[in-house]
């Protein structure tokens, strides 16, 4: 077996499959593009679903890739096991309706065992297979695998919901008896026992059925196009080929671990307690790549995952004695390890470091807040006479504040309290079950549509015309091909068309189809790409249509021009965002409609009003500069040399279209555009908002809609000016400010008057002092305007030694407000109010020294006051 670096393993994998006629699919962005079912790209096949479900036919049915992936459903296991990671690299080879079982197994065995390639010893390889899949068993035998090395496993059948499914065969490497201390042997495989002896290095999925949850597996229909989907973990292959005990001792992780050794002054012991080293090395890889791909830490979705990973890594750094910000210092090491295939981490190093460091600094402040919350919980336990911190509270510390359970346990036990481990596990399991359920719901592929996949007739989109005559090539009605149609809805393919199919954020054209007499025979309501790329027109049929007949196709020109204004403005906006807030503000989604444009981009905070003003100004400057718009067709490399901005995650063919707006913007784009930027007329941002962690959205309008937006603002300003009696529009802001200042002064004066009135009334209230259970207390109903006045009473009470406890009740409108304040450790205000509030049909809580409650039954106020003594 060859001893190769991880980079050599990756390259040899790709080279082997290229020698078998495969095209190399570049690694996609970790943030899925146009796939809301996935939080992250989590496998090599995740970006190829469109090929497997038949919605798109690839140029080459043989594909290979090395795909960076993230899975975070079991974060807690990272660092505890030898092979669990959040970010990993999946090597794959795929066949879309081309070769199948025989070639997949034979070529796979060749790659693993040939001296020209990996050169694994054959006697160290074991394979599992689905018991009913005798063909795979026989093919392995034909390759020279001993029957004793083939293990039937009932679970070797891959399916996730509806869509492609089939048996799979897994390949394992036997590391020998040293990793099998109990000498269990092949039962480890047969009974799926967790072990370190047999390491799964490759899984070959034989996708041959359309899974249908409504029928038994034996009744699944064969796929019209059988597929091969395989995945081999680079980290596992590296561990085996480099003789490493775990994945972490490979060249993918050890350079990071060595840097952590320098930062901590501690030494990594492969046989000792090394969990913190592993967690940090794993998590900084995931953070570096995810942030580089446009995801940012936040409180939900992907952002929440990244924030949790970072905080977990920081806490493990503290366990190693690293108390200052340090994770950001590891980003260059991650980039250097992966540079040969993934240069993006080093290219975006400064930005990634900035985000990681900023998040570390934020977490340092959060730790202080979490410590304060834990202190409050422990104080409450003491007041209530309890000795155990509940699992739900531990989980809240963990989930909300990022506190590891070990830290909570350590601090609580130091204070003399026990930990409710079972309650915590229960809360954790509930969250994990929710996460796994979400993954299962979104994981399936669509079923293949044989009718659409069977369209092979050529069709060409013509960019520079709004109307043309063309022959009707294909009619599909009720999911069947037909030669003619006279009513209902149908799908049509023409030899050529002026109708743009929805793509790249630009909506489809609409329009009409006319016969040779000039009569409208169909209305085009939508256009989408067929699996083989042809524009597929969805039409409402008004009169007879037949294959082979020529028709005149006319798009709605006015609508197209409105869409083009927004699409061209989107390119200007993208460039302006780069100039004003930074090059990290890359496109995360867009929509170019007739009435507006919507542009999503990566950014870590709200865009300020001043920045929006600059962006809007810059876009309009380019409109007024009347920049010429040109389009060029070339290859991707030439386009990049031209400075074209490629959207990360988009797949480009051999020939790409470059749209250049003067010297201001150059992008790869297949959409339609204006001839000159001046045709946009006017650009106006109407909204900026956050739509998820690290993703912002701008909605803008152009042309007529922009003019109307400005006019609406002017009308609103005129109305405000009239209301505040401003002599001119320019004076309205000053008049509003003057009124606001006057109102603030009056409110301040009102508060002062209320405080004086409360102080005067307090003299009478504080005279009525009672005593019970050795505690002096005041219990009184007061007449106040709001709950804030009750707090003013309490503040005055605290200034002097009137009593130990104060209970005030006020009927304000239809509600009852209750306040309890305590100066003695013998009475916990928060606990006391829980006993009093139900009397007035209310509830509340608070701290040991102050608590408040709200109720709805004012008729029971006297009863509440009478109950104060017994609730002390």
Curated annotation (Swiss-Prot):
GO biological process assignments: alanyl-tRNA aminoacylation
Molecular function via GO: alanine-tRNA ligase activity; aminoacyl-tRNA deacylase activity; ATP binding; catalytic activity, acting on a protein; transferase activity; tRNA binding; zinc ion binding
InterPro entries, per the entry: aa-tRNA-synth_II/BPL/LPL (IPR045864), Ala-tRNA-lgiase_IIc (IPR002318), Ala-tRNA-ligase_IIc_anticod-bd (IPR018162), Ala-tRNA-synth_IIc_core (IPR018165), Ala-tRNA-synth_IIc_N (IPR018164), Ala-tRNA_ligase (IPR050058), Ala_tRNA_ligase_euk/bac (IPR023033), DHHA1_dom (IPR003156)
SMART domains: tRNA_SAD (SM00863)
Cofactor(s) required, per the database record: Zn(2+)
GO CC terms in record: cytosol
Subcellular localization: Cytoplasm
PROSITE patterns for this protein: AA_TRNA_LIGASE_II_ALA
Enzyme Commission code: 6.1.1.7
Annotated family: Belongs to the class-II aminoacyl-tRNA synthetase family.
Function: Catalyzes the attachment of alanine to tRNA(Ala) in a two-step reaction: alanine is first activated by ATP to form Ala-AMP and then transferred to the acceptor end of tRNA(Ala). Also edits incorrectly charged Ser-tRNA(Ala) and Gly-tRNA(Ala) via its editing domain.
Identification of the protein by name: Alanine--tRNA ligase
Species per Swiss-Prot/TrEMBL record: Streptococcus agalactiae serotype III (strain NEM316)
